Amino acid sequence: MDIISQCPDHLLLRILSFIPTKDVIVTSLLSKRWGSLWRWVPKLEYDFTRQNMRFVKFVYRSLLQNNAPVLESLHLKNIILYAECRTVDIGGWIDIAVSRRVRELEISINCSDEKFRLPSSLYTCGTLESFILTIKHCHLVDVPLAVCLPSLKKLHLRCIGWAYNATLLRLISGCTNLEELRLARPDDDGDYIMIHEAGSTIDYMSIFERRYMFEFMFDQMFGKGSSNGINAPLKYFSISNNYRIHNFRGIEKMPDWVEARIAVTGGSHKYLKEITYAKGLYVCLSVSEVMNPYDMIFHMLVDLTICTCTQGWWDLLTHMLQGSPKLRFLTLTNDHCRELPSLETPACWKRPSSVPACLLSSLQAFTWSGYKGRQGDKEVVKYVLRNATGLKKRIFISKSNDFGEKFCMLQELASVPTPSPSCQLLFDRIF
């Protein structure tokens, strides 16, 4: 402890920033020097898992006594609204944080009422850069008409619903520099829709021009509507877990796509051909779920990941190799749906009629996460490795706990010849 006490204040404050506030204040008992140091910690975290009236008063007291010139972050975790912890208390804590120029705010609330209100001061906080809100068992209401969050770049909302469609649009329209938006159900880490425009600004007018996009997200997250469209110059699009999409407007005219992540299955998901401008693509689909797969050409695609849990993924692989002339990185995985087994490529797997252009010229890395060394798996590996003339890395990650089995896999993989003598073989390693 003497060694730590000799550290400068700024270093001690940084260390204390990673500790829950309740424990930080206990350090005031260590020595005279530590007595007031806790008051200057710029990051505050309160866990209400075992809350009572005494803890509620403690939160008020420690917030009011904090002297940090800028409150870098405030986390209010696992709040349960009841007689001793009320909506007005949460509003008071947020008001204090706003007055201290808070930059990051994260709140998770379990509410028994049908409606929940945030204080009006939050909607005009000029310093807030990140806001993560989780509300269970209620709707967020009373978002003011005038929302102004000019510094907000990241907005994550995990709510069961909104009082009106306009509420969500009104909130987002006030975030004039928003870079990342994520909407999710509060009880499901898998179901989410995320829009991320990296490195650029979403201005006020473009928010309203994207009305269809946000109506789509609202409807799909909370179960309303059946026909929606997306009409927006997005650079990152992600959708997962059986969201039903019936109409994409203008999406095929987006040459600025950077990445599209599609982790969905189901008969209505036939829109893969609409995002042929994507540079990065994650798919968990079979060819039968894609409309006109034979006509798809991904002129810009350089990074492709295919999930191996779906029946017929091997045929999708064939078509994607044939239709992706600039592909540089190919990954096979079943990491996103571990409860489903990886399906083995059948003996009747139809290989490309001719060697795809990407194998002859551009492919640099081939990765298989969850490789099992089955006969069908080996046939896919042999085809790719024997034809990829410019391959630099071949990476295989096995989930087996049997050392002997893994050693046999490694021997078999090492015996497959590659056109490039400098191609590295990495087994159970990412780097």
UniProtKB/Swiss-Prot annotation:
Keywords recorded for this protein, A-Z: Leucine-rich repeat, Repeat
Presence of the UniProt keyword DNA-binding in the record: no
CDD domains associated with the record: F-box_AtFBL13-like (cd22160)
InterPro entries: F-box-like_dom_sf, F-box_AtFBL13-like, F-box_dom, FBD, FBL13/AtMIF1-like, LRR_dom_sf, LRR_FXL15/At3g58940/PEG3-like
Domain spans labelled FBD: 348-398
Domain of life from the UniProt record: Eukaryota
LRR repeat residue numbers: 52-78, 85-109, 132-159, 160-185, 309-334
Keyword Protease: no
Domain F-box stretches: 1-47
Protein name as catalogued: Putative F-box/FBD/LRR-repeat protein At4g26350
